[in-house]
């Protein structure tokens, strides 16, 4: 979406992607959720002492 609309602000891209996400069924979301869990576990293993600090 960002490549198709290079002048669009990140906040607008996030809103549109969020709206598209809400339209997906649980089955369509499942691969992304599973991948997110896998990546989170991998990150926790590689960086056990990591603390988010904004």
UniProtKB/Swiss-Prot annotation:
Family matches, as PROSITE patterns: HMG_BOX_2
UniProt DNA-binding region: 1-54
Domain of life the protein comes from: Eukaryota
UniProt keyword terms in alphabetical order: DNA-binding, Nucleus
InterPro entries from the UniProt entry: HMG_box_dom (IPR009071), HMG_box_dom_sf (IPR036910), SRY-related_HMG-box_TF-like (IPR050140)
Subcellular location: Nucleus
Pfam families reported in the protein's UniProt record: HMG_box (PF00505)
Main location: nucleus
Annotated SUPFAM superfamilies: HMG-box
Signal peptide region: none
Gene Ontology molecular functions: DNA binding
Any single Gene Ontology cellular-component annotation: nucleus
SMART domains with a match to the protein in the record: HMG (SM00398)
Name the record gives this protein: SRY-related protein CH4
Organism (species): Gallus gallus
